[in-house]
């Protein structure tokens, strides 16, 4: 790859005011000479003629020359900014490809070269794609934080503490267990406490960053005809779900994306939970339970016109079914307008009960404010964007850390501790790309836009 020069259109295909081409690689100087007639002044915008193979003008525009290593990719880079005609862009690309050893760039290849040439770490490279695909202001700001290296800083800080820990204990590795003095044992115990706190804080922040990227799954569940579909419609300001008086109308999962307090949330309407002989409806109910167990938050809708004892039984039965699940539950007491009770929120044993009318909209703003209150900790300028692979690697590192801590308590074996710390460093290093397989890189960068 390093011996090939690549070209791609940076701007979106189609007609536009401006079209930009980017070229990177060792042949870029030759491209500049053949297309521009010269190598432009480095890092200056130069008004240039773009020439074809007969030195006739194809277009006029701005050329930008970035000689290696001070460029996006760390290689020689040339950008041509011309008129955004698809025909002009195509003619320029064909002209550039006619030069030897030049090919079209693969998706994300410019960013991949930047990573491989040490211009950015893997987190920063991934955050470029996350910034482009951001759907809320908060996720865009978090992506920018990652691009600027804030996430990487915390990973490297933790890695440096691990390395420092290893250096301290490996200096004692040639001594017997009897010779390990009390002072060293105290140092190790202090280091364990320090690292434990660092891991927990970082894991909490990374989880917030993951929610910004992946979105939060909010499942709307309940018995048939409780008003689940009406709640989906009013929360999403749409008529996404069909609403009827017939029980079992909703049989499959209905998805609707909304933004709450800058966090992307996926609302999921589910089939009414009940015993039924209908085979198709039973499948829908099974899917509903599966989604409930996978969700971050359940809005469990209850028909408030039912008796108090019936409402309590419904709540108790549902909580028993998800007893071992960490999913957060809010009980939404719907049809409050029919009994003319007060609208509002009550908390019982830490669980919220909110009275609303999905038909009239009364009380729904209280529900929205409740959801916003739950998400408020995510709305923090210090949050950075995070991916599932980051969480996985951090979990692996933390699990190994807990294993190391337990093993040390039991055996006080310096060699085993040093080996565990080495494994932890490897897991953390994979997050920023210090130890990364080619398959992983291909998987990450193949999802990028062409031209990035």
UniProtKB/Swiss-Prot annotation:
First-tier enzyme category under EC: hydrolase
Localization terms from the record: Cytoplasm
User: Which molecular function terms from Gene Ontology are attached?
Assistant: GTP binding; GTPase activity; metal ion binding
Cite the binding residues for (6S)-5-formyl-5,6,7,8-tetrahydrofolate.
22, 79, 119, 452
Coarse class of the primary localization is: cytoplasm
Q: What does this protein do?
A: Exhibits a very high intrinsic GTPase hydrolysis rate. Involved in the addition of a carboxymethylaminomethyl (cmnm) group at the wobble position (U34) of certain tRNAs, forming tRNA-cmnm(5)s(2)U34.
Assembly behavior: Homodimer. Heterotetramer of two MnmE and two MnmG subunits.
Q: What is the protein name given in its UniProt record?
A: tRNA modification GTPase MnmE
**Which species does this protein come from?**
Buchnera aphidicola subsp. Acyrthosiphon pisum (strain APS) (Acyrthosiphon pisum symbiotic bacterium)
Q: Which gene encodes it?
A: mnmE
């Amino acid at each position: 790859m390093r011996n090939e020069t690549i070209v791609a259109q940076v701007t979106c295909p189609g007609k536009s005011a401006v079209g930009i081409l980017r070229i990177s690689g060792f042949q870029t100087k030759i491209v500049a000479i053949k297309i521009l007639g010269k190598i432009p002044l480095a890092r200056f915008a130069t008004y240039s003629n773009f020439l074809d193979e007969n030195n006739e003008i194809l277009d006029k525009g701005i050329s930008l020359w970035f000689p290696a290593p001070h460029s996006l990719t760390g290689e020689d880079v040339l950008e041509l900014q011309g008129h955004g005609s698809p025909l002009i862009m195509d003619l320029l690309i064909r002209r550039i490809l006619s030069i030897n050893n030049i090919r079209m760039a693969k998706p994300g290849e410019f960013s991949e070269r930047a990573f491989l040439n040490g211009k950015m770490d893997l987190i920063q490279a991934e955050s470029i794609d996350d910034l482009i695909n951001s759907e809320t202001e908060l996720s865009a700001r978090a992506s920018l934080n990652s691009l600027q290296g804030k996430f990487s800083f915390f990973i490297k800080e933790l890695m440096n503490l691990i390395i420092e820990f290893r250096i301290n204990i490996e200096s004692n590795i040639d001594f017997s267990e009897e010779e390990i003095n009390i002072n060293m044992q105290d140092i190790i115990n202090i280091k364990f406490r320090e690292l434990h706190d660092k891991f927990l804080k970082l894991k909490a922040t990374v989880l917030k960053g993951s929610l910004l990227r992946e979105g939060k799954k909010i499942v709307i569940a309940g018995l048939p005809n409780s008003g689940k579909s009406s709640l989906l419609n009013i929360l999403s300001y749409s008529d996404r779900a069909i609403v009827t008086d017939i029980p079992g109308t909703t049989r499959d999962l209905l998805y609707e994306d909304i933004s709450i307090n800058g966090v992307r949330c996926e609302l999921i309407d589910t089939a009414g939970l009940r015993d039924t002989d209908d085979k198709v409806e039973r499948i829908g109910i099974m899917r509903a339970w599966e989604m409930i167990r996978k969700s971050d938050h359940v809005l469990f809708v209850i028909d408030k016109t039912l008796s108090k004892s019936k409402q309590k039984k419904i709540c108790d039965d549902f909580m028993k079914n998800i007893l071992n699940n960490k999913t957060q539950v809010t009980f939404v007491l719907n049809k409050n307008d029919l009994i003319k009770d007060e609208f509002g929120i009550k908390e019982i044993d830490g669980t919220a009960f909110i009275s609303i009318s999905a038909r009239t909209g009364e009380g729904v703003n209280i529900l929205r404010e409740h959801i916003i209150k739950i998400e408020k900790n995510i709305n923090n300028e210090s949050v950075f964007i995070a991916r599932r692979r980051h969480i996985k690697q951090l979990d692996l590192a933390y699990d190994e850390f807990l294993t190391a801590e337990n093993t040390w308590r039991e055996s006080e074996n310096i060699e085993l501790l040093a080996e565990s710390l080495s494994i932890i460093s490897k897991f953390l290093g994979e997050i920023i790309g210090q130890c990364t397989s080619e398959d992983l890189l291909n998987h990450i960068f193949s999802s990028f836009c062409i031209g990035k």
